[in-house]
Amino acid sequence: DGPWAGRGLDEIVSGDARRVLGSALAAARRGRFPLLVKALDASKNLSIQVHPPDGYASVHEGGGPGKTELWYVADADEGAGVLCGLRDGVGREAVLRALEEERLPECLRLIPVKKGDAIFVPAGRIHAVCAGVLVIEIEENSDITYRLYDWGRKGRPMHRGKGLDVTDFADRSDPLLAKRWEEGDGFRTARLARMSSPEADLPQIVLQRALDPVVEQP
């Protein structure tokens, strides 16, 4: 109903970005809706990749935004996991050697996951979803991906130079997010992460009973 009836978010934002996003975010995102939500169902290991921060993307990728992601694990086979972040003691030279010798997975943290887990993937953190994991991926609306390793599969381009440039080798934060639940009336909520660009809270909300509808009076 109303003037936006039947229109998608991309149409609404492109037609009136300043009204929907605010002036600052509309300018920074060039009129694009700032977030994407995808479902990734990994029947086999996905490529190992890394995304740039905004500053690098602005200089080297024609002004486009970088990308930070959050994965919510919707389902996972027993024993399945994700690769996310560098193992302790692994620096640039170790990653470079591993790339040359086609053994990059050895450099990364293998994190077992189960349904309901949340994984934070900021720009600069090397990562891959492994076989047997279904994630809901909430990410910045950017197409910039630097692929580093593809499990011996041929035919897709690698971007190892830029990937090494943007990798945060000082990053040792735990990608698996701890949840602090707050109880509400018939629901509970936990803030999974806070993204700074665009500025957004990413909550998880669990309904414990049906909520009474709010009826607006004419």
Feature map (PLM): residue ranges:
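Short, well-ordered, mixed-charge alpha-helical segments that flank or form enzyme active sites
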Residues: 56-57, 79-84, 90-95, 121-122, ...
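Transition-metal
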Residues: 1-90, 150-193
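Active-site glycine-rich loop that binds ribose-phosphate moieties when present
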Residues: 90-120, 142
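Fe(II)/2-oxoglutarate
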Residues: 105-112, 133-218
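Conserved metal-binding segment of the jelly-roll/cupin
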Residues: 48-51, 112-131, 140
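A generic structural signal for well-ordered coil/turn residues at beta-strand boundaries
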Residues: 33, 44, 66-69, 115, ...
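Short edge beta-strand segments in beta-sheet-rich domains
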Residues: 68, 130-133
